[in-house]
Each structure stands twice: as C-alpha cells, then as structure tokens.
Amino acid sequence: MKTIIALSYIFCQVFAQNLPGNDNSTATLCLGHHAVPNGTLVKTITNDQIEVTNATELVQSSSTGRICDNPHRILDGKNCTLIDALLGDPHCDGFQNEKWDLFVERSKAFSNCYPYDVPDYASLRSLVASSGTLEFFNEGFNWTGVTQNGGSYACKKGPDNSFFSRLNWLYKSESTYPVLNVTMPNNDNFDKLYIWGVHHPSTDKEQTNLYVQASGRVTVSTKRSQQTIIPNVGSRPWVRGLSSRISIYWTIVKPGDVLLINSNGNLIAPRGYFKIRTGKSSIMRSDAPIGTCSSECITPNGSIPNDKPFQNVNKITYGACPKYVKQNTLKLATGMRNVPEKQTRGIFGAIAGFIENGWEGMIDGWYGFRHQNSEGTGQAADLKSTQAAIDQINGKLNRVIEKTNEKFHQIEKEFSEVEGRIQDLEKYVEDTKIDLWSYNAELLVALENQHTIDLTDSEMNKLFEKTRRQLRENAEDMGNGCFKIYHKCDNACIGSIRNGTYDHDVYRDEALNNRFQIKGVELKSGYKDWILWISFAISCFLLCVVLLGFIMWACQKGNIRCNICI
C-alpha cells in the first residue's frame, strides 16, 4: 500500500510540473489599462452610450439660490422699479445718484406717485440700466410766467403733497399760461438724458383750470429729432384717486447739440439731466436674496458657478456665464474606455491583457504591466504612456469653456403691445439660437469624447507595439494582450522590459532552444484548461483502475482476504 501511495504522489508531482505557469523556463507578460467597477456612460459620434472610467458633467443645472454681491456691484431695487427711481418717486429717494453693475428689480416693487405711463418703457429702462448710474445734475431752466413745483395728493412725501423729484409740474400763474420757449445747449463732451412729460387731464374743466387753454401742446426737439405731443383729455381708470395721467418721454442731447422745449400748456418739465455712460451694466427681475459671496455669473434664480461651459438654469444671465442649452446633462469623457475586469481568469487563475478586459485597482497609472514568472506575479504602471494621455486630455474642459462662455450678459427683452409682431419674431430668433447652441453643444461634446477614447486606445496600442518590438522572437503574442516569454525572465528582466532597457540578444539563444522543446501542438487559451482537466480526470480514473486491478489480483493470490458480512 505504501508503494501505491508513493507512486500516486510522484505522478501528481509530475502532472503539476506540466501545468501552465509552473514552468520556470518561461514567463507571461500582459499589458493592460485601468478599469473601474462602474463607469460613466457618455455619447460619442459613433455611439450613443459608451462606458468610460471617468467623465465630467458640463451642464450647470442648479443655482446657489442667492445673488452674490461680489465681484459685481448689485443694487437691490427693493420696493422701487428702475423707472420710479429715475423719475424720483418720493418712496425711492434713497436711490438718487446710485450706481450699479446689476440693478435687481423685485416683484413687490410698486409706484406710489402720480399715475404715469412710458410709451417707450423698455427702451428707456434698458438705456438707464446699461448706463449703470442715476447720477443727476440740475440745470437752471427759465420758466417765466408760470407756476412751478406742482404737487398732488396721490404723491405723498410724509404728510405733504409732492411730485416726482426729477420733474417740474408747470401750471398757470394767476389766469395766464404763456407760450414757453426754452433752450438748453449741451456744451459738455458727453450725452445728456432729459426726462420730460405731458399731462393728460381727466376733464376739460381740469384742463382749463390748470393751463387756461382748452388744448395744450408740447414740442421737444434737438438738431437730430423732434417730438410733438398733443394731450388727450379724458377719464381713465382710477389709480390712487386720480383718473388723469402723465406720459413720460425722454430725449438724448449729444455734445454740441441744443435742447429746445416749446409749449403752451400741459408740460411736465425736466429739472436737469442724467449723465449717460456706456458700459456693461444691466437690469434683472429676480426675487432671489442678495448674499455675501462671489460669483461671476448671475441669473434670476441666483448666482451660478461658471466653471462649466453650459447651463440650463435660466436663459437670462449677467456676467461671464455658461452658454444656455436645453440639455439637462452633457458629460465630457476625461478617462478611457471602461472594460470592467472579469472576476475569474480560468481555473488556474491565469492573467489576461487589455484585449479581454481592463484591470481594476491600478492606482498609479492608466496603463501598465502584469507578469507571471518563477518568482510569482506582479503589477506595475507605465507612467510615460499614462502621462502622454493625461497631457492631451488635460485642458479639454477649459478649452470647451473658452469656446462657449458668454462674455456679455443676455438681457431681458421687452416690447410694447403694438410691437407684438417684433416680439414674436425676436422670440423665434432666440429660440432658434438656443436650439442651435444645444445641437452644437451636443456635437462638440460627442466629438471631444470620440477623440478622448481614440486617444487612450491609441496610447494602449503604442505601448503594446513598443513591447513587441523589444521582445521580438523571444516571445509570442498570445492574442489577448499578453506575451509568452520563452526564456527565464525574473523580476529584474520584467523590469527591463517595462523601462525599455531589455536586451533581446542576451536571451535569444535560450528562447529559441525553449521554443523547440515545446510540444508540436499548443492549444489555444480558451480550451487548454478544459483539456487539462479532462486529462487529469482520465489519469485519476486509470489510477483507480490500476489500483482496483491490483487489489483483485492480490485477492486471487490470497495475499488479501476480503470478508463480506450480512
């Protein structure tokens, strides 16, 4: 029996020596790339969904919920609209001579003075907003023969009747209202904005009581323009106890030009001018609170970071902002194609290269080597190819941001009712621009993703070809990203292959000799394990048959006695 056990042990040892990976005269070297268990899906030109190891979101889809007061100068309109602050509504006196980068109008803002309308409200609002200041300068207009500084109970300042502080309500003096003809030259080197108005009484009696004449007229002109307004006497809806109205108009006087005002009644005269400045100031309607923080980009929803090239928070923006697109998400690949590692590598734990799958757990680089030799197994990253890929991918995000960030704000656009067709056309144009930008954004990201994946695949192939050129006939390409090395290759030898100092000639004779000693037929990697198992099973079966035959022979000779008891 001891002899049988000894023979079985010797047989198993011989069999074990023939298993893959146990031949000290060969080694296996595989090349592979980084992989993660769960990658990120991105779009490319050729594939709607391809998994990569890492990706960056390009669409900013949320705001901070507050408007940052830095670096832009924010002026909170509170209860006042910009036009009320411009006219000098008594409850907006705190805004006189204020300056801003962005004027924030609130939904709670209201007028609390004489009822008025501005026929070209949007243009005036935009002009003043872009000027960025309510800086006002009084001028000495000569209104001889009329009473100045009219007021109304609809416009209270404390307990007293008042009026817009930037306007001068003129009405009759005693029983006369002479024809007014006043000029004011612009001798400065900047544009001046004059605000004036026309009063529309609710009844003929109110008209004559204030202006004597049954019908007034106001003409304001410069060398470049002229406006003549005839008051419309008649009742209107009651506002703050009044059914009369004031229409507000405005005139810009260029340097060297002259302002001429001619009227025989109903004139709401200017007290001076606003200095017009050119700049990038703007206005925005928002109820977001103003907070102490820093952000270059502001939307009505609040400030947003501008570290991404696109946003879908709001179409209205101020500052250096990401481009508005319709998509909720656009992901830029910043890693390579992800092929998760298979958890089992055959029944003998063989290693595999990049052709079959990626490698998880590579923390030192994107590309690397795994080896199996007489000293065991090991893994190391290839820093050169990793750095080459990273250098080309780095800066992709910044380049996309540079291509897409708005350098100027997207202002709110308003049109009066009579300009409805213009508004519809403008909306169509704006929607078309957004559709176009959304398409361009998706195409741009898909192109960049395709380039990234092709680039990282190329670096893997370059590393593989570099290794092949070093090994030459000393090794065989196994077809799965691995090389079978036909000479003894310890860890120092493997290291020389990785760092490019491998000397092919040193191992050439040994490799050729080992090639000739290999069996004539070498099975492919997919079937080898199964054949070995079958061979092992047959060998064990034959061993059992031999053992059983020996026992039966011994029983016949009388050397072994077998008793069967029932």
Swiss-Prot record:
Cytoplasmic side: 552-566
Membrane topology: Single-pass type I membrane protein
Record's comment on post-translational modification: Palmitoylated.
Listed Pfam families: Hemagglutinin
Site (Cleavage): residue numbering on this chain: R345, G346
Molecular function per GO: host cell surface receptor binding
Residues passing through the membrane, by range: 531-551
Keywords, ordered alphabetically: Clathrin- and caveolin-independent endocytosis of virus by host, Clathrin-mediated endocytosis of virus by host, Disulfide bond, Fusion of virus membrane with host endosomal membrane, Fusion of virus membrane with host membrane, Glycoprotein, Hemagglutinin, Host cell membrane, Host membrane, Host-virus interaction, Lipoprotein, Membrane, Palmitate, Signal, Transmembrane, Transmembrane helix, Viral attachment to host cell, Viral envelope protein, Viral penetration into host cytoplasm, Virion, Virus endocytosis by host, Virus entry into host cell
Disulphides: C30-C482, C68-C293, C80-C92, C113-C155, C297-C321, C489-C493
Extracellular topological segments: 17-530
A GO biological-process term: virion attachment to host cell
Lipid moiety-binding region (S-palmitoyl cysteine): C555, C562, C565
Glycosylated residues (UniProt): N24, N38, N54, N79, N142, N181, N301, N499
UniProt keyword annotation of Membrane present: yes
GO cellular component terms, A-Z: host cell plasma membrane; membrane; viral envelope; virion membrane
Stretch forming the signal peptide: 1-16
Family: Belongs to the influenza viruses hemagglutinin family.
Primary role: Binds to sialic acid-containing receptors on the cell surface, bringing about the attachment of the virus particle to the cell. This attachment induces virion internalization either through clathrin-dependent endocytosis or through clathrin- and caveolin-independent pathway. Plays a major role in the determination of host range restriction and virulence. Class I viral fusion protein. Responsible for penetration of the virus into the cell cytoplasm by mediating the fusion of the membrane of the endocytosed virus particle with the endosomal membrane.
Self-association state and partner proteins as the record states: Homotrimer of disulfide-linked HA1-HA2.
Note: Major glycoprotein, comprises over 80% of the envelope proteins present in virus particle.
Name of the protein in question: Hemagglutinin
